[in-house]
Amino acid sequence: MKEPSIDVKHIATLTGHSGCVYAMDTGFSEQTIFTGGSDRYIALWNLETLQAEKFSAALPAAIYTICHIPEKNILLAGTTTGAIHILDLDKKEEIKILQHHRGPVFDIQYSLKTNCFYTAGGDGNFAVCSLDTLSLLIMKKLSYDKARSIAFNDVTSEIAVALGDSNVLIFDLFTLENKNDFIAHQVGEKVVGANIVRYSPDGKFLLTGGRDAHLNIWSVENYELIKSIPAHNWAIYDIAFNPDATLFATASRDKTVKIWDAKTYQVLKRITKLNFEAHTHSVNKLIWSTYRNYLVSVGDDKMVMIREVNRK
């Protein structure tokens, strides 16, 4: 059976950040995205005009993660100091700062099912906060290493959290009962950090990326390893599915983005400096937009890169 092929077209490279770009989330509409990074600024970009929008927020520390919650019209930004800045997008002002982490905030995600947002920190803590009061509800110490990434399975109502000690913990979304935990990445006998967790949109698989440069596929039914792929040359930092869930992309410290078939887990395209306009440094974050199937990547080279991906 012939492997499906895809076309990747470079649309634009957007410049404006003066430091590494670590954070990205969807914007006010499908054609806008927020970005943030070491220059301490949050920018808003338009994927249609390929220009920066008239929006800018300056924070007192480098930004590792941003989370746009359109239902509340707020933007959350986690920084290297452990602060979570909450911006009211209607009022265009900061309305609150949460400081429950004692290390950098690596990830912020939210769930309308629980009306909460969730944060993962370099202090090994995982926190649950109310979307109504914007205050801390629960704090769990998960590791003496970092808590790096959070993912929701909407089908099974589970939360996965990736830890720097290589463990991935699975919690019940509503009760936070620990349902499973396993070592996700190791090289021989040595365990290495898990950087990113991402559920497949159908809820059947959990994908993890680690410091070992491997992409691991786990069955959600029992969290047993189905496949381990030496996907990159350096650590994997992000995984993003395309809108129809037939493809996914991985981003790595090795400066590349790779596009994979979501059924066969075969690599379909390698985006490197050899064959594309590509990042010159670590690629940190991906968004696969519903707008024209654009795959957006950001990295340590300060660039926001936009590519259109279509099946041939």
Question: Model regions: which residues?
Answer:
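Residue-level detector of Asp-centered blade-edge/turn motifs that repeat once per structural unit
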Residues: 28-29, 70-71, 112-113, 154-155, ...
